[in-house]
Amino acid sequence: CAAYAAGDPTHWPMTDAPKPLPFQVIGVGVVFNAQDELLIDQRLEEGLLGGLWEFPGGKLEEGETIETCIARELQEELGIAVTVGAELITVDHAYSHKKLRFVVHLCTWVSGDPQPLASQQVRWVRPEELKNFPFPAANARIIEALLGSLG
């Protein structure tokens, strides 16, 4: 074989060093209304994690604060205005093709009727109802922190 002929059979086959995974910061809003219900949305069927439920949010843009990101994403994707409050938790999660950091803040709904502008549907639910909806694995720690904060 070529490696033996070259005098170094342990050097072959040569592989490139693994490339670092892309990293993104995601701002997430856990939005409460006046009835202490939470807003969740269902991801579109096509694409990664299709059909699962999630807390709304999106990618942090360059030069943007996480609070601004959350407010912007909820306006763009759901058509609502919120007041972004305290940070609840930060969750790092790795997929096979990228690493994500979810920075999660508690939010208060201010105005706008939530619309599924970038999802299948949106729903207000009681915290104890969250267990009835399938969420991505990365959301388990968010739900745990949320329920723990509610006592």
Feature-to-residue mapping (PLM):
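Amphipathic alpha-helical
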Residues: 1-8
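Conserved Nudix-box catalytic region and its N-terminal flanking loop in Nudix hydrolases
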Residues: 33, 37-81
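Active-site segment of metal-dependent pyrophosphate-handling enzymes
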Residues: 25-27, 71, 75-113
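Short aromatic/basic micro-patch
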Residues: 54, 99, 123-124
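Conserved N-terminal beta-strand and adjoining loop/helix that marks the start
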Residues: 8-38
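NUDIX/MutT-family hydrolases
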Residues: 106-146
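Generic C-terminal helix-cap and adjacent flexible tail
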Residues: 147-151
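Conserved hydrophobic/aromatic beta-strand scaffold that supports enzyme active sites
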Residues: 30, 40, 102-106, 124
